[in-house]
Amino acid sequence: MNRYLDALGVGVPDAALFEHQGKPNMLTRFEERASPLDLRDRDAVQRVRQDFVPHAAIGNWDALGLDLDNVLIRPDGTPTYVDVGGSGPFRAMGGPKGDAWGSGTSDLDTMQFKPPHTQDVFGNMSEQELGQSFDRYGGEDAFMDALQHLQDASTRNIMQQRVEDIARRVA
């Protein structure tokens, strides 16, 4: 999902997939001089909040990380998401989401309130804010174009349905 977010323009480090002991792994480039998100920095929190819809689209339940360690703030103030392993059909530790991953986008609502930190950053987003987050990254056309970066056909199909659902909701 790194490539999908990158195609949208969401900050993610360069990444490469490789196999280790028969299991897929991802190696990401170190984000030099990036610092952890500080919830007291309202400007940084607002910039992360603007990235919500792309993360909800991919089902990145762990966008912020348990200790706010999955999002860093680069020296120029832009967020970078250094671990999107909890997105798509997989949970943060690699297990399948099963029926919790599908074409519907209840994540637009439920991801605003997943403990421990999402309510502090994403909580109570208005429909207008959701629409602005979607439009910030090019809206339906850009979200659909980015699907070409997803290798698995089933994931691509589900993502297409999720994008269509989001577009209907925030139109």
Where are these regions (language model features)?
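Conserved kinase catalytic-core segment
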Residues: 34, 40-94
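C-terminal catalytic region of ATP-dependent kinase domains
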Residues: 74, 78-171
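Conserved ATP-binding subdomain of kinase catalytic cores across diverse folds
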Residues: 1-35, 57-61
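Short, structured coil/loop segments at alpha-helix boundaries
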Residues: 37-45, 152-159
